[in-house]
Amino acid sequence: MKNKFGKESRLYIRAKVSDGKTCLQDSYFTAPFKIAKPFYEGHGGFMNLMVMSASAGVMEGDNYRIEVELDKGARVKLEGQSYQKIHRMKNGTAVQYNSFTLADGAFLDYAPNPTIPFADSAFYSNTECRMEEGSAFIYSEILAAGRVKSGEIFRFREYHSGIKIYYGGELIFLENQFLFPKVQNLEGIGFFEGFTHQASMGFFCKQISDELIDKLCVMLTAMEDVQFGLSKTKKYGFVVRILGNSSDRLESILKLIRNILY
């Protein structure tokens, strides 16, 4: 089934450093994508880009493709305007592919808003990030069990989120998360374990210290309303997963982690 736009929906962004400041070198988008004017706030020297959508949410047949290229030393935070609502679907699916390319010294923080999969929805997302020496990459995701406040919990059809990360041409991280409520007990052990929201975050760069991991563990352990797991990857990174009962709460925790990272 084709989406209402009749074609793949694309967003392309390229950023560079000019006079010591990250700026937008090139951009291109098709419906429903739009991007707001870049803005600069906070610390870290990031150019903040907000991705907007003219659609009410993700619909059956939607096919999204986001490509980001960062030149040497560019620092970009890419975030969404509002929650990503994945609407009910008859028989089809919706897909999204993200491609990120980071040159030497570049830093991308990919921070989409929380995702809410409605009943009978099916969504497939794949992300590929290619990092050159000296670059850094953060990704995060918050997934709700559904429209929780309406009592719609784990009634989506399928949800898939996959990510591959390459550093200097070497595959250093691969993860695939498949959620199928009809065949999996998503409220049980190994899944949401009685919680309604899940946050995931990964940070990848060559300098990941044990002191950083210890600091994050101490901070998260002190939070009694969530459960978490944090592990260093085989090379150049760590991943943390947090279970809670509120998107706002998990967003605030991810913000605290980011404040430690940069």
Swiss-Prot record:
Please give one Gene Ontology molecular function term for this protein: nickel cation binding
Q: Could you list this entry's UniProt keywords, alphabetically sorted.
A: Chaperone, Cytoplasm, Nickel insertion
Q: One cellular component GO annotation, for this chain's record?
A: cytoplasm
Give the matching InterPro entries: UreD
- Assign the protein's first listed, main location to one coarse class: cytoplasm
**Any keyword Cytoplasm?**
yes
Cellular localization per UniProt = Cytoplasm
Q: How does it associate, per the subunit comment?
A: UreD, UreF and UreG form a complex that acts as a GTP-hydrolysis-dependent molecular chaperone, activating the urease apoprotein by helping to assemble the nickel containing metallocenter of UreC. The UreE protein probably delivers the nickel.
Q: Which PANTHER family match?
A: UREASE ACCESSORY PROTEIN D
Family, according to the entry, reads as follows: Belongs to the UreD family.
Q: Which HAMAP family match?
A: UreD
Q: What does this protein do, in the record's words?
A: Required for maturation of urease via the functional incorporation of the urease nickel metallocenter.
Protein name as it appears in the record: Urease accessory protein UreD
Gene encoding this chain?
Answer: ureD
